[in-house]
């Protein structure tokens, strides 16, 4: 995705972010479960913590939007999910690489939204969201370093 979605209000941005946070929380919960099944306890713990962060972000956004009618985020922004079918090789490195790419795409999306934003409040919020995604990516990158080669 090279273009930023057209986001003209804080509510639109929060709607997109809420959808992304909910999907990420579910994705990380699934990855935590799968890593625990394979006895990769450190990764299961990492994905559990990331899932908790994403759920916390979603709850924060929900509180901020309390009672407001939200625009439908469909078509405004989408990120590829981390998708592994049962036949996929779920090596620790492969899972971490996929998770890192997902966080980097989310960061890049928010950076593009910030760069294209006409409204200062949208720009500030998108910059904050990009920074949060960067923090998630840093956690994943640190876990990759811990794997060695």
For the regions a language model picked out, list residue spans one by one:
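Acidic/His metal-coordination segments adjacent to aromatic residues that form catalytic metal sites
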Residues: 2-17, 80-100
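Helix-loop segments that flank and shape redox-cofactor active sites
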Residues: 2-7, 24-48, 106-122
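Alpha-helical transition-metal enzyme core signature, strongest for iron centers
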Residues: 20-28, 47-61, 99-106, 126-140
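Carboxylate-rich helix-loop segments that flank metal/cofactor sites and access channels
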Residues: 59-94
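A mid-sequence interfacial segment
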Residues: 88-128
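Short, charged, intrinsically disordered terminal tails
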Residues: 142-149
């Amino acid at each position: 995705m090279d273009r930023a979605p057209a986001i003209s209000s804080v509510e639109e941005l929060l709607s997109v972010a809420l959808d992304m946070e909910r999907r990420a929380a579910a994705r990380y919960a699934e990855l935590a479960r799968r890593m625990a099944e394979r006895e990769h306890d450190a990764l299961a713990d990492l994905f559990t913590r990331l899932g908790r962060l994403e759920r916390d972000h979603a709850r924060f956004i929900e509180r901020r939007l309390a009672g407001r009618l939200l625009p439908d985020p469909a078509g405004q922004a989408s990120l590829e999910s981390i998708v592994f079918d049962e036949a996929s090789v779920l090596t620790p490195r492969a899972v971490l690489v996929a998770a890192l790419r997902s966080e980097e795409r989310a960061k890049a999306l928010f950076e593009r939204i910030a760069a294209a934003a006409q409204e200062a409040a949208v720009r500030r919020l998108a910059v904050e969201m990009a920074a949060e995604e960067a923090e998630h990516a840093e956690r994943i990158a640190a876990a990759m370093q811990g794997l060695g080669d």
